[in-house]
Amino acid sequence: MNPLTRVALAVAAFAALVLALSACGPAHVAGHVPKRRDYAVPDAAGQEAQAASAGSTWREGRAASMLYTDARALRVNDLVVVRIEEIADAKRSADTDLTRRSELNASIEAFLTSLDAPYALKGGATTGFKGLGSTARTERLTATVPAVVRKVLPNGNLFIEGHRVVLVNAEEQHFYISGVVRPIDIDQENGVKSSMVADAEIEFTGRGVLSDNQRQGWLSRLLGWFWPF
């Protein structure tokens, strides 16, 4: 075997080793444990499942329209696509105007008759305060997150939970949603709007270089804690 072939084989073996190690490495920017919500029914009383009558495939209390619709997510581990579109717009303003005035006049002529009138004591004070403040905040979140049916509640509603991770240029974005939906609100494409999700928890977080640069450094936070102004 000539030296050139030997070097080529060594380089190929090293490249294969690097690829194998990278394939076994984590795909996340940092260690990550998916969130799992332990949802408990707020009040299970009066929500007991109704058994179907003998020889009947229809259960009393189920929405009548569900009998004629296409197959939808109704069981544990079925998929539901949640279309998140949350818009929050809040405004607040306050105006305060306060004025206070006091005067004091006192004469000592009755005690010191030799003093002229200009020696009478007079005093006055005026205080005022005026404050004006306003705040406005607008937020919008739009995303599509597939979710899984985790539980079927006694009344037929579904507890769903979904988690989606997107990694772009060493920046990791996490979408999470969980909540309760009615089967009747799920459309023919097994999708549901986030506005129809009850007890919803929606989270959008990021990790990576961009998210780290948006955080204030520890020294700046320490100086800000000590600085009184």
Swiss-Prot record:
Q: Where in the cell is it found?
A: Cell outer membrane; Bacterial flagellum basal body
Using the record, list the residue span of the signal peptide; answer none if the entry has no such feature.
Answer: 1-23
Domain of life from the UniProt record: Bacteria
Where would you say this protein principally sits, based on its record?
Answer: membrane
Q: Which InterPro entries match?
A: Flag_Lring (IPR000527)
- Molecular function, one GO term: cytoskeletal motor activity
Under the heading PROSITE patterns, the entry gives: PROKAR_LIPOPROTEIN
Q: Does the keyword Membrane apply?
A: yes
Positions where lipid (N-palmitoyl cysteine) attaches: C24
According to its UniProt record, what is one Pfam family this protein matches?
Answer: FlgH
Give the record's GO CC terms: bacterial-type flagellum basal body, distal rod, L ring; cell outer membrane
Q: Where is the lipid attached (S-diacylglycerol cysteine)?
A: C24
What is the similarity comment for this entry?
Belongs to the FlgH family.
**What does the annotation say about its assembly with partners?**
The basal body constitutes a major portion of the flagellar organelle and consists of four rings (L,P,S, and M) mounted on a central rod.
Name of the protein described by the UniProt record: Flagellar L-ring protein
